[in-house]
UniProtKB/Swiss-Prot annotation:
<dbReference type="InterPro" id="IPR009030">
    <property type="entry name" value="Growth_fac_rcpt_cys_sf"/>
</dbReference>
<dbReference type="GO" id="GO:0010976">
    <property type="term" value="P:positive regulation of neuron projection development"/>
</dbReference>
<dbReference type="GO" id="GO:0005005">
    <property type="term" value="F:transmembrane-ephrin receptor activity"/>
</dbReference>
<dbReference type="Pfam" id="PF07699">
    <property type="entry name" value="Ephrin_rec_like"/>
</dbReference>
<keyword id="KW-0325">Glycoprotein</keyword>
<comment type="similarity">
    <text>Belongs to the protein kinase superfamily. Tyr protein kinase family. Ephrin receptor subfamily.</text>
</comment>
<dbReference type="InterPro" id="IPR008979">
    <property type="entry name" value="Galactose-bd-like_sf"/>
</dbReference>
<dbReference type="GO" id="GO:0045806">
    <property type="term" value="P:negative regulation of endocytosis"/>
</dbReference>
<feature type="modified residue" description="Phosphotyrosine; by autocatalysis">
    <location>
        <position position="779"/>
    </location>
</feature>
<dbReference type="InterPro" id="IPR013783">
    <property type="entry name" value="Ig-like_fold"/>
</dbReference>
<feature type="active site" description="Proton acceptor">
    <location>
        <position position="746"/>
    </location>
</feature>
<dbReference type="GO" id="GO:0051893">
    <property type="term" value="P:regulation of focal adhesion assembly"/>
</dbReference>
<dbReference type="GO" id="GO:0005769">
    <property type="term" value="C:early endosome"/>
</dbReference>
<dbReference type="GO" id="GO:0016477">
    <property type="term" value="P:cell migration"/>
</dbReference>
<feature type="binding site">
    <location>
        <begin position="628"/>
        <end position="633"/>
    </location>
    <ligand>
        <name>ATP</name>
    </ligand>
</feature>
<feature type="topological domain" description="Extracellular">
    <location>
        <begin position="21"/>
        <end position="541"/>
    </location>
</feature>
<keyword id="KW-1003">Cell membrane</keyword>
Amino acid sequence: MDCQLSILLLLSCSVLDSFGELIPQPSNEVNLLDSKTIQGELGWISYPSHGWEEISGVDEHYTPIRTYQVCNVMDHSQNNWLRTNWVPRNSAQKIYVELKFTLRDCNSIPLVLGTCKETFNLYYMESDDDHGVKFREHQFTKIDTIAADESFTQMDLGDRILKLNTEIREVGPVNKKGFYLAFQDVGACVALVSVRVYFKKCPFTVKNLAMFPDTVPMDSQSLVEVRGSCVNNSKEEDPPRMYCSTEGEWLVPIGKCSCNAGYEERGFMCQACRPGFYKALDGNMKCAKCPPHSSTQEDGSMNCRCENNYFRADKDPPSMACTRPPSSPRNVISNINETSVILDWSWPLDTGGRKDVTFNIICKKCGWNIKQCEPCSPNVRFLPRQFGLTNTTVTVTDLLAHTNYTFEIDAVNGVSELSSPPRQFAAVSITTNQAAPSPVLTIKKDRTSRNSISLSWQEPEHPNGIILDYEVKYYEKQEQETSYTILRARGTNVTISSLKPDTIYVFQIRARTAAGYGTNSRKFEFETSPDSFSISGESSQVVMIAISAAVAIILLTVVIYVLIGRFCGYKSKHGADEKRLHFGNGHLKLPGLRTYVDPHTYEDPTQAVHEFAKELDATNISIDKVVGAGEFGEVCSGRLKLPSKKEISVAIKTLKVGYTEKQRRDFLGEASIMGQFDHPNIIRLEGVVTKSKPVMIVTEYMENGSLDSFLRKHDAQFTVIQLVGMLRGIASGMKYLSDMGYVHRDLAARNILINSNLVCKVSDFGLSRVLEDDPEAAYTTRGGKIPIRWTSPEAIAYRKFTSASDVWSYGIVLWEVMSYGERPYWEMSNQDVIKAVDEGYRLPPPMDCPAALYQLMLDCWQKDRNNRPKFEQIVSILDKLIRNPGSLKIITSAAARPSNLLLDQSNVDITTFRTTGDWLNGVWTAHCKEIFTGVEYSSCDTIAKISTDDMKKVGVTVVGPQKKIISSIKALETQSKNGPVPV
């Protein structure tokens, strides 16, 4: 009894300290029983009645609390039970029991060594209803034996120190509606300070704008997947889900919700945009402030309303400021030239806040009373166009002479159609003069002699009055117009005498009316006879017919001879040679085979381009943007919409303003060449525009641009089969050109275009190129130089361009493709390239290049052009490789490489090098001399230790020279083993 009293005294004095530091209960724990919160007696059943005893105390707030204690340590065989009241389970699947208790150290109590215990037992029993005061021990299931981590002694009693223990045990799963807990004392001195029973749940939460409800874990093994619901004013982007763990924790958030248009995320909710702000789209972006000249007056706005006289076009984004129509154009100036006028004006002072300002020209023909006007004739032409002008100038032609016109220049932008105010325009009135005659189109040579030429021509198509006379201008071609003669003729023919024999003369003719002279005709060249023999135009035709007939008879005789030879057994005797009928070094082309016609043989380039190309109406073409600058002007992308056909994307080359006649001939000459080709691997000409300005060449649009830059951009991203497919397309296109008798002269990856389907097409059909006597030896066009790295040796040395020289170039293209656009011969100078190729050196195989493809490269680079394969053979070889992909898996090995590769210097005698500079010259890296000299690599030992990283550090960063130097170093090491080699 003294023992029990000591516990009572200790509890009553120390229970305050036990609860002095309150720890907040976690939000994921739900109490089913908490003895500290029960007011009044607990009313638990104690059996036997003299066992557990209920006592009272107070907490730190002096609130009464109830505890149980037992301390029957003097008697043997103690079996004291304490049972709680019936506890409803609610939704718990697993429960936790938290016990706070004190326990007396048996060693501190005298005379109880045989009867005192330091543990007690915890039991539970499930039931669907309350059993009242009935108590049966055998119905309870043991949970655990509870021992104290710390027990108190007699000394602690004296110091009034209470050592409180806390133990937690799990119970479950529980299935019935409720349960009892029971505590069995077997002889301990123990006091139950508090009992708490709880279960864990995942509490309500909001994550990624999705609400997840309170969730109780199902069991201890698996996670519970919970589907979330979006908060108000939001919608699912991805279905929101989270997993509830057995510890009551939310894990692995998946999916999310986003705020509706007009709402933004604030404080885990979607709240309406404030007035003056808007949000146009669903999503978790913030509300934005209304753009200039717009506002909102209510919450939750999805867009802002424009102010009065401001508008938003249908295609304008909500974030764009509201705009208004532009003001009228300013400072209109007219420059009249007979029956045409050039109108210039200044931009409006106010563009309305937009960049899409364009101008429309309204033309009115007026009587002598300016107020009486009518629309102009549809024959009036506007250059570049009448509507949608982006520049502040327009040329109007084909007006009537001596007529009053009024031109109204409208300024419009993207919101002009939405505006109710009147049109914003500036007007100018003009009166045309009498027009000069149009040019003479054609000059015909009627008769020539050694000192005279007779010419005739047609009257101009538009005389614009009575022709008074014609001015004939002529000069010797070699004089280049430095000295010329002019005479006048009243009719449409003239004989010019006192000319030099066997001399070419250039003629131009223009007509004159009361309004003045028209423009000169284009230049025509005619030659006088070398002697007194003269021949009329009609006689020359007779002679030509006779010559043609004679040639036809000869050819017919040859054909008959061949047929007789076949009949008499020629086939058996010459079977291998009968495929072609040979004439010298060439062969007879049979009827039906299409042959390339050089457009430069036409006197009039317009005639050639109209024969081979389709004339397009400029109104069917729309230009989107400028993508580059070409040889004669800008290169643009745009769209072509022909009547009854689908709109297509096109590339557009334009002839720049201020072009010369020669530039126009060359520009149209390229179209005349392209127009003759029709092949899936040749760039397709859609047509030309020559009847309005600017003059344009329109081709199909290739989305991926030039092949070399495309490959560099997608380095190592294609399979070998895909690369071979590209090469096969190029070879097929070149076979077509070769069969037509066309020599490209500039075949390189930069001149191959590739579309979105990886189809390669040959382009850049060539203007005349002149080989300079420059040691760098580059072929020159009017647009720049073409490096000789793609040019065959005979073309460099003898200006001999053939289909075989195109095959050499194809081998370089093959190397470019397999190296993903690497520059042939790297940083070698052109002079070094010429020297190396003449000495038999060839490019090495690119990394991981199939042996079959590298062998094809070497075949294309045969010095004797007759030994190179034909394009027909190249196509056949590539077809076989595509059908047999396994043959492409054999990679060119170092051992199998020929010894004449540019980067294989094993055949170079290292002992011949006296200095580092000599060595670098010998391995084609002379440009590295200063680098190595600067870092004092001057001996064999130091050279042999250089690594790739070392070269990068000293400035040799290009892969080609690195490989050459490393290859030479390996050879140097081999020779160094046999003795020192000064370098």
